[in-house]
Amino acid sequence: MPYKKNYKRSAYNTLGYLGEVLIILFLKCKLYHIIKHRYRCPLGEIDIIAHKNKQLVFVEVKTSLFNKNIPITYKQQKSILKSAKYFIAFHRKFANYSIRFDLYFFSLSTGLIHIPNAWQES
């Protein structure tokens, strides 16, 4: 039984990774520069960090095979906010950039849904 559980987790990780790669290609087509993919720090993880025209975008990607909108929790939002602050603290060249937090949903049935400014620091 543990094999099936690990296999399922691996399949979800692969699906999530493919969704992130798709969004990276989408952002590159929109002329964004990708800074980091799967950025990790002691405070959390950010799927994609990109910039364009003095705007720094922190992206969360949710991927599903079917029409299943996967919510982003308040706890996840706070983790991404803290990780973004950590990133900027160690990459001072982005300190004067405007910041945006975007959310992308992707599924085979609904396609790509982009929510710019999905949340803000409160």
UniProtKB/Swiss-Prot annotation:
GO terms for molecular function: nucleic acid binding. It holds the Pfam family UPF0102. HAMAP family: UPF0102. Belongs to the UPF0102 family. This is UPF0102 protein Erum0631/ERWE_CDS_00560.
